[in-house]
């Protein structure tokens, strides 16, 4: 994560986030509503456990009490029950990312769960939402797409695909003479 975008995200979280126990001057969680959230900030908010939502914010006002319904994709005024806006989540996985307090903890937890179940001879669990892969293209992959795909355990990746690299231990030996 770049320090400038992390700093900008931390500034936003400072006003809306929750204190992190035993970590001074840092917050997590919260919600961020925006008409358009730049991808670099959207991803950093996801990493921080915040809930970024792109929606029409023209009817939202400072200090207004709202009812946020992520499963319905609606924000309503708490006092009048007026529908303020509707939205669609970029991915259903965002719900798990918020529950896990960030994208990185979710990835780690999901991979540990998957590997443990595999070792125990159990089927993959359905407690996690999985990203949808929409690859219906018959085109081949570029070398870069194949390289990333190999790291993720698939043939290749396309723009917009979600993939997680398979991690293992790396050892480096340095000989002193």
Place the predicted regions along the sequence by residue:
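Short glycine-rich or small-residue beta-strand-to-loop segments that form or flank ligand, phosphate
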Residues: 165-168
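Conserved small/polar residues in nucleotide/adenosyl-binding loops
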Residues: 174-177
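C-terminal binding/interaction regions
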Residues: 83-97
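Flexible inter-domain linker/hinge segments
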Residues: 105, 109-152
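Feature captures the catalytic cores and cofactor-binding loops of soluble hydro-lyases/lyases
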Residues: 1-76, 81-86
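N-terminal glycine-rich anion-binding loops that anchor highly charged ligand groups
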Residues: 155-160
């Amino acid at each position: 994560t770049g320090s400038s975008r992390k700093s900008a995200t931390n500034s936003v979280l400072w006003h809306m986030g929750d204190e992190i126990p035993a970590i001074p001057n840092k917050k997590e969680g919260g919600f961020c509503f925006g008409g358009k959230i730049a991808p670099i900030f959207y991803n950093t908010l996801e990493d921080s456990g915040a809930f970024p939502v792109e929606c029409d914010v023209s009817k939202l006002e400072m200090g207004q009490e709202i009812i946020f319904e992520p499963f319905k994709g609606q924000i309503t005024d708490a006092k009048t029950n007026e529908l303020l806006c509707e939205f669609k989540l970029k991915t259903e996985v965002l719900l798990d990312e918020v529950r896990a307090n960030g994208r990185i903890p979710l990835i780690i937890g999901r991979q540990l769960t998957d590997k443990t179940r595999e070792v125990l001879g159990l089927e993959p669990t359905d407690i996690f939402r999985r990203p949808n892969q929409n690859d219906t293209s018959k085109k081949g992959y570029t070398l870069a797409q194949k390289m990333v795909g190999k790291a993720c355990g698939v043939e290749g990746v396309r723009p917009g695909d979600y993939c997680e690299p398979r991690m293992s231990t790396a050892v480096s030996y340095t000989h002193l003479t």
